[in-house]
Regions:
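The catalytic Tyr-centered alpha-helix of NAD(P)H-dependent dehydrogenases
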Residues: 59-63, 94, 128
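A structural signal for short coil/turn segments at secondary-structure junctions
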Residues: 40-41, 112, 143, 169
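Mid/C-terminal beta-alpha module of Rossmann-like enzyme folds, strongest
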Residues: 142-177
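Substrate-positioning beta->alpha
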Residues: 96-104, 118-137, 157-164
């Protein structure tokens, strides 16, 4: 009856090195899921997207932006047929999720290695797992065809985030490079 579509190639480096995998997973895969849902008469589909789909600057963001267009196109078709309700959530980084930067920083500190960052001024919009689940459930309960739900989240620079993780571990000797 219901689908929560979270399958994605979500790591920026993976999408940069393998852009066709990003296309096949994030765009074509989503289209396949939505066509199957519509054909099967699924009542509601909630798709998960990312803040990187807004003004995308890398292959992952571009693929997720196109994924959203696929979602909205399928939502229109399904609504015209009076069937499946398809909506979408878009949020930033879920703290401590697989592939997020916080576990990487923790591993680097524990190993006695420097914390490596590309640019200390890069901004990340952060939410915890409960906030992410609440957003998805809100979309599930209240979504209309083609709706996009965006969670306003706290922002942090990568540099400040690295310093905060250092402080949590009582670490004063690890360099941030």
């Amino acid at each position: 009856d219901y689908i929560f579509h979270a399958a994605a190639l979500k790591q920026v480096p993976s999408c940069e090195f393998f852009p066709m995998q990003a296309v096949q997973t994030n765009i074509i895969g989503t289209d396949n899921v939505l066509h199957a849902a519509i054909d099967a008469g699924v009542k509601r589909v909630v798709c998960l997207s990312t803040d990187k789909a807004a003004y995308p600057i890398n292959a992952m963001g571009i693929s997720k932006a196109m994924m959203e267009h696929v979602i909205f196109a399928n939502a229109r078709v399904a609504a015209e047929r009076g069937g499946t309700t398809i909506c979408c959530t878009r949020y930033g980084n879920v703290m401590c999720s697989r592939g997020s930067v916080i576990p990487l920083f923790i591993d680097q500190i524990k190993a006695g290695n420097p914390i490596t960052i590309t640019d200390p001024n890069m901004t990340r919009f952060l939410m915890n797992l409960d906030e992410a689940v609440d957003l998805v459930m809100f979309a599930f309960q209240h979504g209309n065809p083609g709706d996009l739900f965006i969670q306003k989240s706290d922002a942090s620079t990568i540099g400040d985030l690295a310093k905060a993780v250092q402080q949590l571990f009582g670490d004063t000797g690890t360099n941030i490079i």
